[in-house]
Amino acid sequence: MLGRFFGRGAGGNWRPPAQELAFASQAGFDTVQIRSDRHALEDELGVDAAELGRLFDEHGLEPVLELLVRYDDDGGAATRALEATLPDLQTVGVLRVHVHPVGHVDPAALTADLAGAAAAAEEAGLLFGVEHNAPGHRLLTRLGEVEALLDAVPRLWLVWDVNHTPADEVGGYLALRERFSLVHASDTPLPETNWHLPLGQGTVDLAPLRGFDDVPVILEIGGLPHSGGPGLDTDEALLDSLAWLRGPS
């Protein structure tokens, strides 16, 4: 359930995978999300895929991967990102991979690209998902867009980001639960979205998150410049957010 929001060189609390996975295991997390912006895991993390897979196995943790993909009126970005990382995914032992699309592309081209990537991932035995964006971005910002995309691409999974979701759309996203491959959890002072605060520092209703026993809930609490970050993903904040997520003992 751990995902440092910012990576190496981005001003957050990044550290080498051996240290990060040891912390996650000792703290009681069961899943760790890797984020790749350049689609080369060794370049991102400083260790090769075989060593990374060994570390995940050693600590008994599930690896999941987020690929940031940038569209510039050109379809195919998600498929290219998946193809570039697929050998590493299989070596590490990743089951759940998703893209976080940014930029601009025609909706039909986006749908076609995600359909192709989802089919390729399914053939490789992977669950391939897409993360929706917060209002103010260009791609997949409203519930209706997400519903239409999932209807058009039955193989595609969804990563629900609670911190991207206006309060009046929460119920609609929960109705899509059977399509969730991951949930991203952080807090925000609604109606503002996309602050990525530690849990308990905003106004998000956390209660629905406590019922996801079959889907990993990833803490993305790094913060953004407008919300006091990056750097809010300290060990103490992650442990406190994990306690919020688990609720009263």
What are these regions (language model features)?
Residues 2-10, 14-28, 53, 85-88, ...:
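Histidine-acidic metal/acid-base catalytic patches
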Residues 127-142:
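Conserved anion-binding
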Residues 43, 108, 137, 141, ...:
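Residues that form or flank phosphate/diphosphate-binding pockets in enzymes
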Residues 161:
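Active-site glycine-centered loops adjacent to acidic/histidine catalytic or metal-binding residues
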Residues 58-61, 120-126, 151-156:
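Short helix-capping segments at alpha-helix termini
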Residues 107, 111-118, 127, 143-146:
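Hydrophobic, well-ordered secondary-structure segments
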Residues 21-25, 30-111, 164, 215-218, ...:
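Structural motif corresponding to the early beta-alpha repeats
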